[in-house]
Amino acid sequence: MANYKGRGNVMIRSMLLGLYGIINIVCVNGTFINYKDALTKSLIFLEAQRSGKLPPNNRVPWRGDSALDDGKLVNVDLSGGYYDAGDNVKYGLPMAFTITTLAWSTITYEKELRATGELENARAAIRWGTDYFLKCASRKNRLYVQVGDPNADHQCWARPENMKTPRTVLEISDKVPGTEIAAEAAAAFAASSIVFRHVDHKYARRLLNKAKLLFKLAKSHKGTYDGECPFYCSNSGYNDELIWAATWLYKATRNHLYLSYLKFEAISAYVAEFSWDLKYAGAQILITKLIFEGHKGLDLYKQQADSFVCSNLPGSPYHQVFTTPGGMIHLRDGANSQYVTATAFLFSAYADILQKHNQKISCGSHQFDSTHLMAFAKKQIDYILGHNPQGRSYMVGFGPNPPKQAHHRGASVPMHEANAPLSCPLSFVKWYNKNVPNANELTGAILGGPDRQDKFQDLRWTSVYTEPCTYINSIAVGVLAKLAAA
C-alpha cells in the first residue's frame, strides 16, 4: 500500500489484512504512516549496501557485483559484507554492530517480523554479514577488520561496481590487539547464532564457536585498535564491547563463565546514548531482563539502564539529552538519526520487559511505565517518517517529501554513465556537485537527519544531513516491526 496524505489532526488506527498479514497504518497530523512499508524499505536499503557477488533475488536493480577480489592482497577471500554508508569501504566495527543490532531486532520481534512477512529478509540480511565475518575470522587469532583505503576512496566519487581505488586490508591479532572490534564481532556472532538456532543448527553452532574464540582473543589481548581512525575511532574504549559480547554469549550459551565476567570483572558505566561506539546501555537493558528472570548480583546494571531512560525521557527530572523544538533527540551533528533509532529501539525493548514483569522505572520522584517508554519510542520513529516541523520524511522513497539527494556514490551515479573514463577529481564535478536528484533511488535509507533546530538540507554535499548508515536502519527494524504488527 502506498503512503498518502490525508486530512485532520487525529490519530486513526487502521488494521488491514493484506498479503503479509496485519498492517498497522497510523494517521498523525494528516500524514499516514505505513509502518509495514517503512519496515520493508528499511531492509531493502541494507540490500543496497551489499558488497560482493549479489544473489539472483537482489531487489535493488541498479546494484551489481562489486569488490569481488577483496582480500586478494592477503590471499584470503574477503568478498561480501556491507559498505557502511555512502562510500565504498568495508569497516569492521560498524558492520559488526549493524549485524548485532539487526540480530537483536530479529530475536526480540521475530513474531512481528513473521507477521509482516519480513522475517526471511531480516535473516538474509544478517547472514550476508555473518558469512562475511566468517571469512574475516578464518585464521586463528586473527580478524580482518577493514577492506579499502578510506583516504583514497574519499577522493573519488564512483559506484562500487566501477571503483578503481586500492582495496587494502587491515587486521587485528594476538600481536596487534583490537579489543573493540574483536568483542563486537563476538557479539554479532553470538546474537546471530540465536537467530539461526532453530533454522540452521549447524550454522548457528559455527557462529557460536567463532564468538567464543573472538571473545577470548578480545579479553586475553587487550588494546585499542586505531587503524580505522579518523573514520571509526573508538572514543569510548573497549569495556563496553566486552560487556556487550559477554552478555550476548551468556544469552546464547547460558555458560556461567560469561555471567561471572559480568558480575566480577566487567567495568560498566552510566551513559545517555547507545551507538556503534558505545554499547553499555544495550547490554544494561539485556542484563536487566536477566535480573527480572531471577539472576542475582547484577543490580548495578539495572540502575544504569534506568539512568539511560531517565536521561533521555522528557518529563524526567534527570532529563539531559537535548530535544529539538520538534521533539527529536539530538546528541550531535552527523548521522544523528542513529541515536534516534537506537534510543527508540532500546525504549521499545525495555518497555516490553517492564510490561511483561509489571514493573516501572523511577526517575527521582517520577515513575514511568512501559506505555511512557513506548510512546517516546514511537514519537522518535514518527518524527523520522514525517511527523516533524518540516513535514517531510527522512527515509528515502517513503512518506511525504522524502529526500532526493542522499550522500551516496552508488545512488547518485547513473548506470549508463558509470563507465565514463573520468579522473577522480572530475567524478565530483560530474556526479557530486550537481543540485539534482540522485539517478537511483536509495529506497529505505534513513539519512543523517535534521539539526538541533529541526532544519534539514537535502543536498548531496551536506553529508551531516544526507548520508545514510547501515546501523541507523538495522536498529530501526525491530521497532518498525513492532509498530507494523501492533
UniProtKB/Swiss-Prot annotation:
It is found in: Secreted. Its main location: secreted. Belongs to the glycosyl hydrolase 9 (cellulase E) family. Residues 1-30 form the signal peptide. One of its GO terms (cellular component) is extracellular region. Its EC number is 3.2.1.4. Glycans are attached at residue 29. This is Endoglucanase 16. It comes from Arabidopsis thaliana. It catalyses: Endohydrolysis of (1->4)-beta-D-glucosidic linkages in cellulose, lichenin and cereal beta-D-glucans. PANTHER family: ENDO-1,4-BETA-GLUCANASE. One of its GO terms (biological process) is cell wall organization. One of its GO terms (molecular function) is cellulase activity. InterPro entries: 6-hairpin_glycosidase_sf, 6hp_glycosidase-like_sf, Glyco_hydro_9, Glyco_hydro_9_His_AS. The active site is at 87 (nucleophile), 407, 458, 467. It comes from the Eukaryota. It holds the Pfam family Glyco_hydro_9.
